Amino acid sequence: MYYSSPTCFVLITIFAVVVTQLIFMRTVSSLNMTNAYLNHKCLANQGKYKPGSWYEKKLQSIIVSIGSGDGFTLGYDMMALGKDSDYVAVTNQCRGDSNGSMCRSCFATAIARVTRCPRYKGAIIWYDQCTLQISPFDTQGKFDKDNDFCMSNKKKMNVDSFGEKWMTFLDNLVGIALKDHLYAAGDTRFGTKKLYGMVQCRLDIYNNSCRECVGHIAVKFQDCWHGKQGARVLGSGCNFRYELYPFVGSNKRGRNLN
């Protein structure tokens, strides 16, 4: 069930489009070492498009436009064409510490892996550094309650109060993110260790929806992350992660929240 609208990501079969994106990848090889593929979902209920169709042509046009634009500086870009049944949109959101060339490279990497969903109108793909979403619907300002997932460390925390501690920390991070481009990273003391955390909402999501999105995935996947030494939960509109080691770029490592 959608909070407002679906997530997405689709397939193009023309390698020329991928090559166009690769022109902008100055550090793809080195980035891929730290830009792990995380997951993807092909949304069959959004239908498929035919080779040479209007949808495919407009999709390719959008991808080329985003790849040659300046949205990577901000770390976010969204472009759409058409209306009603001919509507197609592409949204790229990079992690807050992955702007510029890293964001551009992640976008190109995601486009190059688009064959995971051959000719699907709707799908989404997650990488460590970015999330690419392609949709036949308008998703601006909306998040999807269905297409999300959790990854966690098998090792457990030896502290009963971890859940309460993390939720307080996460709430503090969300508060900071709402004042700073919907992204925040920081650390807090947890016994004898430091707990590092990060939270982000897609830039077109409004403040109240951002907090609701994070709260939704935190509760939905509580059995996955609770008590684990590290975890990340990702959706189409927001995501969070925590570890016992720093994992974001030093320029965006954030503040101590003790």
From Swiss-Prot:
Q: What Pfam families does its record include?
A: Stress-antifung
Record flagged with keyword Secreted = yes
Residues covered by the Gnk2-homologous domain: 37-139, 144-247
Protein name, please?
Putative cysteine-rich repeat secretory protein 16
**Main location, first listed in the record:** secreted
Protein source organism: Arabidopsis thaliana
Indicate the family of this protein: Belongs to the cysteine-rich repeat secretory protein family.
Signal sequence, start to end: 1-30
Taxonomic lineage from the root: Eukaryota, Viridiplantae, Streptophyta, Embryophyta, Tracheophyta
Task: Tell me where on the tree of life, at the top rank, the source sits.
Answer: Eukaryota
Q: Name one GO cellular component term.
A: extracellular region
Signal among keywords: yes
Q: Which UniProt keywords apply?
A: Repeat, Secreted, Signal
Report the subcellular localization: Secreted
